[in-house]
UniProtKB/Swiss-Prot annotation:
This is Large ribosomal subunit protein bL27. Disulfide bonds: none annotated. Residues 1-22 are annotated as: Disordered. GO terms for molecular function: structural constituent of ribosome. It comes from Aliivibrio salmonicida (strain LFI1238). The gene is rpmA. GO terms for cellular component: cytosolic large ribosomal subunit. Signal peptide: none annotated.
Length: 85
């Protein structure tokens, strides 16, 4: 008779759900007020003109226009702004 002993246990087998972070509207895209531009942890991107920042550091459009990404300042920070159409 073929028998199989009990298998051992494992301490792995878990993973967290992905948070779907990243850029949601790219440079040159048209946005409406309230549209989410970037979901992020911390300020990888900073809010420029016509862009608001949420409590979880989400950047969103405050007015209608086109998205513009730029690097500026002495620390070469990335800014996201909205150029009004």
């Amino acid at each position: 008779m073929a028998h199989k002993k009990a298998g051992g246990s494992t301490r792995n087998g878990r993973d967290s759900e992905s948070k779907r972070l990243g850029v949601k509207r790219f440079g040159g895209e048209s946005v409406l007020a309230g549209n989410i531009i970037v979901r992020q942890r911390g300020t990888k991107f900073h809010a420029g003109t016509n862009v608001g920042i949420g409590k979880d550091h989400t950047l969103f459009a405050l007015s209608e226009g086109k998205v513009k990404f730029e690097v500026k300042g002495p620390k070469n920070r990335k800014f996201v702004s909205i150029d009004a159409e």
